[in-house]
């Protein structure tokens, strides 16, 4: 019997989830300088899954916000496996307000299975927190650049994913649902996750072909194999994106962001026929 070959999309999913894959704070340490983390949403508490603060990018003051998952058991618990609670999104809203007040470009970094689905999160307004973040990012006057580092899962990713430019690492994924979740809904079994991953179109090259992502950063066989090279490749692309956005007038930039969002799902993207 011929051995079945593993789908390219499912291979990408597995690389995106690799336990040694660089995480948000690894990139911060390599790409930015003088990072100073800020804590709390001034409403309920601090969320370890959402990390953010002031930093410098090539000497320029910026705001950096991202989801951190953790590696050790202690770290994973501290950062809630990268699954944000409402206070995480409200913390990011506070930092976005600060960025606009002081005219700081914003860099967001996505790496989450999704927003935390616990009862407490729902009681504290998870959906409202994400919706408010979407609205705020849509109208922010400063440049916003979002990067998908590993998993970009559903609304949890979108909460910091609305941007002027979106970047994906070549083995990252970005989707409305996990392949396992999709398979469980469509086929009543998570065993068809590989098939679901193909159907979801969650890979960087597919999303770039649809115009949803502007840049794809090459990471070879996986960022965990040569993290320093991948981080430097990403830094070059971040600089390119920022250089494109800085000369634009704030109103012009907001209008371009609006038009970028409005074209999603249109015929010119090849989604509808």
Curated annotation (Swiss-Prot):
InterPro entries: Acetyl_CoA_COase_a_su (IPR001095), ClpP/crotonase-like_dom_sf (IPR029045), COA_CT_C (IPR011763). PROSITE patterns: COA_CT_CTER (PS50989). One of its GO terms (cellular component) is acetyl-CoA carboxylase complex. Residues 1-244 form the CoA carboxyltransferase C-terminal domain. SUPFAM superfamilies: ClpP/crotonase. Its EC number is 2.1.3.15. GO terms for molecular function: acetyl-CoA carboxylase activity; ATP binding; carboxyl- or carbamoyltransferase activity. Coiled coil: none annotated. HAMAP family: AcetylCoA_CT_alpha (MF_00823). This is Acetyl-coenzyme A carboxylase carboxyl transferase subunit alpha.
């Amino acid at each position: 019997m011929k051995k079945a070959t593993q789908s390219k999309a499912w291979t990408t999913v597995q690389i995106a989830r690799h336990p040694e894959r660089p995480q948000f704070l690894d990139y911060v340490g390599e790409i930015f300088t003088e990072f100073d983390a800020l804590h709390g949403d001034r409403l309920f508490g601090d969320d370890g899954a959402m990390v953010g603060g002031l930093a410098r990018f090539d000497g320029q003051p910026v705001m950096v916000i991202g989801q951190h998952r953790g590696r050790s058991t202690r770290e994973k618990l501290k950062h809630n496996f990268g699954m944000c609670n409402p206070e995480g999104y409200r913390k990011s809203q506070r930092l976005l307000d600060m960025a606009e007040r002081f005219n700081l470009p914003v860099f967001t970094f996505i790496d989450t299975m999704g927003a935390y689905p616990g009862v407490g999160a729902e009681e504290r307004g998870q959906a409202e927190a994400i919706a408010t973040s979407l609205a705020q990012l849509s109208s922010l006057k400063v440049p916003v650049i979002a990067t998908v580092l590993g998993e970009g899962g559903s609304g949890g990713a979108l909460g910091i994913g609305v941007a002027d430019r979106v970047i994906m690492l070549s083995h990252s994924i970005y989707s409305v649902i996990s392949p396992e979740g999709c398979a469980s809904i469509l086929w009543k079994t998570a065993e068809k996750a590989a098939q679901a991953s193909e159907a979801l179109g969650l890979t960087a090259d597919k999303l770039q072909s649809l115009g949803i992502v502007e840049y794809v950063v090459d990471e070879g066989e996986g960022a965990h194999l040569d993290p320093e090279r991948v981080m430097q490749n990403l830094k070059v692309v971040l600089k390119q994106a920022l250089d494109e956005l800085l000369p634009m007038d704030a109103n012009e930039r907001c209008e371009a962001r609006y038009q970028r969002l409005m074209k999603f799902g249109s015929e010119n993207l090849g989604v509808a026929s």
